[in-house]
Every structure is written in structure tokens, then in C-alpha cells.
């Protein structure tokens, strides 16, 4: 009788052990199948990165998130590695444990060289610029281009272009030209522009009025203080 109980107990333990091993195997398979395939992830547009910047996984992931705000959290600067070639960047899982949650690869396009002669503006068709001493600040000019609907990638900065205002009959036109030797931008384009209106609180007459009021207030305060001291004496 006792032997039968021992045998039943042993059989039960063996069954439990087999069940545990089976569950463990299933768990491993589920985990293995739960890997995220990079190729299934979307990227709306080309990444606004230079080839040099695209060699940095952190910058690639950051730009990818700009194009795909719901990018899976498994994709991080540490979980992927990148390789750049032919104006494209290939994203693959990082080596070792860092990339074990990922599989496959994803090829992302880079914006490449911005060809200025291909830029177009929105419905306004004109830029709004602030001209000082016949010149336009490049940083402000790039901002005006983007506000007017021109698709200028983030790879183009104020050191890459110049804005030159025309003369005589072309005084209402500005030439945007790539600086020689730059790899992010090329060519040139001419746009019509209107001069930005100065806000009333920045006009000369308003600033002069404020200065006069401040001086008058200070002078009045000094006069009152001196007069009061004389009375006290």
C-alpha cells in the first residue's frame, strides 16, 4: 500500500516536472517570436540628416521618431546599429543582448542635397523679409522660407546659404544661393518678397516716447525728493 502511494507520488512529480519543462519551452518560443521586425516599421518621409549625422544611431532614432511619432519603444539608440551608403541608412539590431528584442532590418532614405532651384513657395508665392542695410540675415531668411511653405530640410543652416537683395527694378527680389563647398545644398533661386512690418512697440517713435516718459518720471522723482528734503531742513 505504501509502495503504491510512493509510486503515485513519484509519477505525479514526474508529470509536474514535464509540465514545467513544457511551459518553459513554450515561454521561450513565445519570447523568441515576440521579436520586433524592423522592416515592419513605418517612416513617413526621408530623414533630415546628413550622411555624417546618419552614422550616429542616436540621431537616426531621434529623426525616425519625428517621422513616426508612434515608433516602437524597443527601437532605441542602444538597441540598433546603423550603416550609411548611397544616401540611405540601414538600421539593424545591435549586437549582443542590446538588440535581442529586434530582428530584420530597415532601410531609411536621407534627404540628400537640397536643390534650391527646386524650392517652391505656398499660396502666397512671396517671402516676408526684414531688410537691414540692404541685407537679409540668413537665419531669418531660412525661417521666412519655411513659413512661406518651402520645404527646406533641417540639414540646411544659416552658414550654408546667402540672401542677396536685388537692386533697381529687382529691389523686390531676393536671390538665395548655396555657399560654395557646402554638401547639404546646391544651386540658387530667386523669390519676390515684401518687407516685414515693424511691430508698433518696436518703432522708433514708440521707443522714443517710452524713453521720454522714463526720463521725465526719473526727473520728476528727483525733483520731488530734493524739494521734500529742503522742507524737512
Swiss-Prot record:
Transmembrane segments: 206-226
Superkingdom of origin: Bacteria
InterPro entries in the record: Phyto-Amp (IPR029216)
Keywords: Cell membrane, Membrane, Signal, Transmembrane, Transmembrane helix
Protein name, per record: Antigenic membrane protein
Membrane topology: Single-pass membrane protein
Signal peptide positions (record): 1-32
Name of the gene encoding the protein in the UniProt record: amp
Subcellular location: Cell membrane
Keyword Transferase recorded: no
Gene Ontology CC, one term: plasma membrane
